[in-house]
Amino acid sequence: MNILITGGLGFIGSHLSYELDKNHNITIMDNFDLNYPGYAKIFRGSKQGVPRISKLEEFHREINVKYRFELIKKSKASVHRQWSFEKISYNNPLLYDLIINCGGLSEAILSKYFSEFCFDSIVKGTENIKTIYSCPIIHISSSMVYGSWEGKIDEDYLQKPVDKYGFNKLYSEQFCDEKDIILRPIHVYGIGDSKFPIWMNIERQIEKDKPVNVEAADCIYIDDFVEIVKNIIANWMPGTYNISSNLIRDGQVLQKIYPKDFIVNNKLGPTGKPRGMLDSSKLFDTFGVKLKYNTYEETIRDYYGKYENLRSQQ
């Protein structure tokens, strides 16, 4: 199958590109580099805004970006250096059998500060590829379309986004049609995540002698995310699906696995109460999904092992 992956140099996109390249012909559309909006910035609260990253944060971001680029080098994927919202020259509508749309501003909290790029990369990019190409797409939307919630919610829950990122993700969904699949993930984590890797957060807080904030929220490990997408491609059934593992982030697990001592502060969600979960039973039932990892601790052990191996190669 000929597959186009927009945002294929990003966290989720690079993993999908690498794995799907084993059985498909992959083309990547992405213009990511170190000038990417927000790469050298990090959110430090409403008072400080988005100042430049520290040397420690820069180190972690660099090694994760390098990891993603190495994944692509190991594949046979061809890379077109442009954004999906720009004019596309290779515009034969029958060029691809499938598009996986991962393009978009990578961090929701930055949508307030990079609003134009957020809109262009999420909304205009989706409209552009849906206008040009006739094949179905897997559109990577976000649980942020629901805004804030409590308890467990399914795909019919009221969509009430609370920030520009969520609004743009919801807006972008309208370009999808009856042959497409929309995925709404929550907190995807793992090796290659350069925006806010777990280990960067722990180490910078240790450096500042401050507690590590951990929100007990739903999430999904990148390895499981990729396996689910492979399953979806093999058993296509159009529709909108929540995608999560229902494994809850746990600061005590991080304390157990990370070798240095640190204090955990259990953070509440934006409502002042524990953040809600996604009901992903529709996805699991439709595609017969089985997760590779049964516990949050298993994913964190795997993540930390890969991270330390990556760090040792620097």
Go through the PLM ranges and name each one.
Residues 1-95:
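N-terminal Rossmann/SDR dinucleotide-binding element
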Residues 76-121:
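NAD(P)H-binding glycine-rich loop region in Rossmannoid oxidoreductase-like domains
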Residues 101, 127-164, 181:
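Conserved Rossmann-fold NAD(P)-dependent oxidoreductase catalytic core, especially the SDR/UDP-sugar
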Residues 113-128, 159, 163, 167-170, ...:
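Glycine-rich NAD(P)-binding loop of the Rossmann-fold in SDR/ketoreductase-type enzymes
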Residues 151, 162, 174-224, 257:
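NAD(P)-dependent short-chain dehydrogenase/reductase
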Residues 188-192, 211-220, 241-249, 258, ...:
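Glycine-rich Rossmann NAD(P)(H)-binding loop
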Residues 228-274, 279-280:
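Mid/C-terminal beta-alpha module of Rossmann-like enzyme folds, strongest
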Residues 294-314:
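Amphipathic terminal alpha-helices
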